[in-house]
Curated annotation (Swiss-Prot):
Name used for this protein in its record: Cytochrome c biogenesis protein CcsA
Taxonomy, superkingdom: Eukaryota
Chief subcellular location: plastid
Transmembrane spans: 13-33, 46-66, 73-93, 101-121, 146-166, 234-254, 263-283, 295-315
Subunit field text: May interact with Ccs1.
């Protein structure tokens, strides 16, 4: 009873803090640069609080249930939200490269946690005895690597989608108008790391009366470079986790079912996901692999990940059916 109450409290704390963080972030779009710095510091600290709240929830559930909390969809969703907070923590402590990845991590975390605690999964929050197939030491290794991989790949793919939006968006006078608040409103939403730099450079360019067409291209180039930089590194990390998850899952499958690979729906879509992001990384090794081509592949991968993670669970068939919506 005590553990259930503690889980409930920690879950709601993390959800509330993420909601506040996202609200603070969007409030910064309405204030000028000097006033927004304090808001950004607060939102960063909020993500840290969220990280420790979810960590406490996972440990509490682990102690209460007696097994690593990754046995059903509800627990994996909470773990995925935790993965997004880790991504933000890494960028938060990277002082050399200022960025605002909470533009991706905060909305993603609140969406995932909101879905996990919604009525669709009202039966799953109750901890249950593991089914025989999950009673293995490989549970922690395999599922944690897969979910961490999903989180990193989703985050990197969203950055690639933002890159495409910036690249193909028509440049209008509104985007580069001298009104700082309007300029900040658009650049802040897509910059994820060059907010301070762009606004400061914008003021310098306007004071020096540098050709407007040059400054437009300069701002767009800076945004695209930063988005490409972070998406490549985060996707590379996610691909590593995904590879480790697939390999450990193959070993586990051989121990449980007597075969390394069975081409069940989950395995098939995991392989498709791995292939798409392998193509992405291959494109990035080419001289012309930066920018649009790789971003398009990553955007396709974003959809494939959700099919692999949720679509297969909707079917509730195959060897991984215990993670479906209908499973308790």
């Amino acid at each position: 009873m005590i553990f259930s109450i503690l889980e409930h409290i920690l879950t709601h704390i993390s959800f509330s803090v993420v909601l506040i963080v996202m609200t603070i972030y969007f409030l910064t779009l309405l204030v000028n640069l000097d006033e927004s710095i304090g808001f950004y510091d607060s939102s960063d600290k909020g993500i840290v609080i969220t990280f420790f709240s979810i960590t406490g929830f996972l440990f509490t559930r682990w102690i209460y249930s007696g097994h690593f909390p990754l046995s059903n969809l509800y627990e994996s969703l909470i773990f995925l939200s935790w993965a997004f907070s880790i991504i933000h923590m890494v960028s938060y402590f990277n002082k050399k490269k200022k960025n605002n990845l909470n533009a991706i991590t905060a909305p993603s975390a609140i969406f995932i946690q909101g879905f996990a605690t919604s009525g669709l999964l009202n039966k799953m929050p109750q901890s249950a005895i593991l089914v025989p197939a999950l009673q293995s030491q490989w549970l922690m290794m395999h599922v944690s690597m897969m979910v961490l991989g999903y989180g990193a790949l989703l985050c990197g793919s969203l950055l690639s989608i933002a890159l495409l939006v910036i690249t193909f968006r028509k440049v209008g006078p509104f985007f580069y108008k001298k009104n700082k608040k309007k300029t900040k409103l658009l650049t802040d939403f897509f910059s994820f790391g060059v907010l301070y730099y762009i606004n400061e450079r914008n003021s310098i360019f306007l004071r020096q009366n540098i050709n407007l067409s040059f400054s437009r291209n300069y701002y767009r180039y800076q945004l695209i470079e930063q988005l490409d930089y972070w998406s490549y590194r985060i996707i590379s990390l996610g691909f590593l986790f995904l590879t480790m998850g697939i390999l450990s899952g193959a070993v586990w499958a051989n121990e449980t079912w007597g075969s390394y690979w069975n081409w069940d729906p989950k395995e098939t879509w995991a392989f498709i996901t791995w292939t798409i992001f392998a193509i992405y990384l291959h494109i990035k090794t080419k001289k012309n692999g930066r920018g649009i081509n790789s971003a398009i592949v990553a955007s396709i991968g974003f959809l494939v990940i959700w099919i692999c993670y949720f679509g297969v669970n909707l079917l509730g068939i195959g060897l991984h059916s215990y993670g479906s919506f209908t499973s308790n």
